[in-house]
A protein has these predicted regions:
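Short helix/loop capping segments that flank catalytic or ligand/cofactor-binding pockets
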Residues: 53-57, 103-105, 195-198, 288-290
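Short intrinsically disordered coil segments
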Residues: 59-67, 109-112, 202-203, 293-303, ...
Length: 327
């Protein structure tokens, strides 16, 4: 174990274990697309913002005295818009009494006991931020639910049994498809299972028995970061949720620090005075929704020379549950 500035650096194998736990349980990271690790704080994504338009070569003219007709080929171009992936830090400090540590052989033995809770804390904040924008550290990143709402990609479900939820899922898929994307999953909290069990397709088949609606894989988020009162479910092309790590998990064992309340500045723990140590976990990552222009939902510009993005195009749609609906 390495000692640095009165702190203990987490052995590599424990950091990897925590990363595997976060990746395996955070639905945002499981369903999204991981990009290569960032080499700096900011990674520039080149997102297509304008597509070329091709056309038949016609409307030629024959100059006076010329034998052959001259035809002009249409001119168009490509354009890209930069989108930044910015690495921001997630952190948690876990104070532990020295009396607890005295019951084990060394400090590292307590790490597996803490790991499970650290994984849970990290996965909850990641999912809550990416899906709902809670505490978002990234400029202009409001979360998938807020951006889908702005794009008009919302479907209301009344919470009843029968075909209503089946229809709501198909309507949400249609919104994604009309935007030029292919839905890859439906995501919700635990109550999504109940909605499937009570759902009957147009053919009278229980969708819950099939496990899918429209061949769309079902995923359940149990991190505590999915607020079903805001959005009951998210349907989308999760390939367009991208993220990258700047630094994977790091842990240091603080032995002589004073921990203060971030809100008030008042002292919470004086580790040396109170015979305590604290495990400090940190991780840095960035996330973004590229949403490039495509030929399905794109629109011709005023000069009809390029295809530009539609304001209503978005790779995700949400299903909301109306008040009074039971499930």
């Amino acid at each position: 174990m390495a000692i640095l500035n009165n702190s203990v650096v987490l052995p590599v194998e424990y950091g990897r274990e925590i990363i595997r736990g976060v990746l395996g349980r955070s639905k945002a990271l499981e369903l999204g697309r991981r990009l290569p690790d960032m080499r700096g704080k900011t990674y520039k994504l080149n997102v297509l913002s304008s597509l070329p338009v091709a056309g038949w070569v016609k409307n030629g003219t024959t100059p006076s005295g010329a034998a052959d007709e001259i035809k002009n080929k249409p001119i168009s171009d490509l354009a890209w818009q930069g989108k930044d992936l910015v690495a921001e830090e997630i952190a948690v400090i876990v104070p532990v009494s020295l009396n607890t540590l005295r019951d084990v052989e060394n400090y590292v033995d307590i790490v597996p006991e803490i790991t499970e809770q650290v994984v849970g804390a990290f996965q909850q904040v990641i999912d809550a931020t990416i899906f709902f924008g809670v505490g978002s550290p990234w400029a202009n990143f409001n979360g998938i639910v807020a951006d889908a709402t702005t794009a008009g990609a919302t479907v209301s479900w009344n919470g009843t049994s029968g075909t209503s939820f089946y229809n709501a899922v198909n309507d949400a898929m249609e919104k994604v498809e009309n935007s030029g994307y292919v839905p890859t999953a439906i995501l919700g909290g635990p109550s999504l299972n109940s909605a499937f069990r009570k759902t009957i397709t147009e053919l009278g088949v229980l969708a819950g028995d099939q496990g899918e609606i429209g061949a769309l894989p079902r995923h359940i988020d149990v991190t505590g970061g999915f607020n079903q009162s805001t959005a009951f479910a998210i349907v989308g092309d999760f390939r367009y949720l991208v993220y990258a790590f700047r630094e994977e998990m790091e842990m240091r064992l603080l032995e002589e620090a004073t921990l203060v309340d971030p809100a008030t500045g008042s002292t919470l723990y004086n580790l040396a005075q109170q015979d305590m140590v604290a495990f400090r976990f940190t991780m840095r990552l960035g996330a973004a929704i590229p949403n490039p222009v495509n030929r399905v939902s794109g629109q011709l510009n005023s000069a009809s020379t390029n295809i530009v993005a539609s304001a209503s195009a978005y790779p995700f749609a949400i299903i909301t549950k109306t008040a009074g609906g039971s499930n």
